[in-house]
Amino acid sequence: KISNKTQIINDPLAVRNMPEKLYSIDFLKLMPPTIFTRSVHEIEKFKKKYKKLVIKPTHGYGGKNILFINKSSSRAKISKYLNKHHHVMAQKFLPQIKDGDKRIFIIGGIIKGAIKRIPKKGSIVSNIGQGGKAVKTTLTKNEYRIAKVVASDLKKKHIIFAGIDLISNYL
């Protein structure tokens, strides 16, 4: 406890040791094609293969500093981004994001609920803090299966309260 009035839910060491983007490395089979890198060359190769990518800082959160690139994006643009953010996660862009993602809430290893987050018009970022809109949703059997796999692992690692995001059956 920080004070008599503040209770800490998640183990602080577990939170420190598991930044959300890096934690996902254990679940690459559930994700769209993804690389973790600080190399412009690696991102260029990845871009050549997948044409459209989203790049996120490995320690980013809240839908901030997300970069969309396509085949016409310059090497200089990527380099400038890497100079600012260093280590990044690059993923094949999923156009289904225009229809939103699902934020799934997990407490004590149990799936407690979900919301669908819809990006504001013209955006690929669905986070509510970045202008996204929350709407009621349910999970498909496959979404539930994916969430269950992650929920079980989070419980083993002493993360009591967490949210995970799915876009079109991908973590």
Question: What is the predicted role of each segment?
Answer:
Residues K1-E42:
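Conserved N-proximal alpha/beta basic substrate-recognition cap immediately N-terminal to
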Residues T6-Q7, K29-P32, K51-K52, H86-V88, ...:
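A structural micro-motif
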Residues Q7-D11, F36, V54-K56, M89, ...:
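A structural signal for short, well-ordered beta-strand segments and their strand-loop junctions
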Residues V40-H41, K48-K52, H59-I146, L154:
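Phosphate-binding site of ATP-dependent enzymes
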Residues V54, F105, I167-Y170:
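Conserved protein-kinase catalytic-loop segment immediately C-terminal to the catalytic Asp
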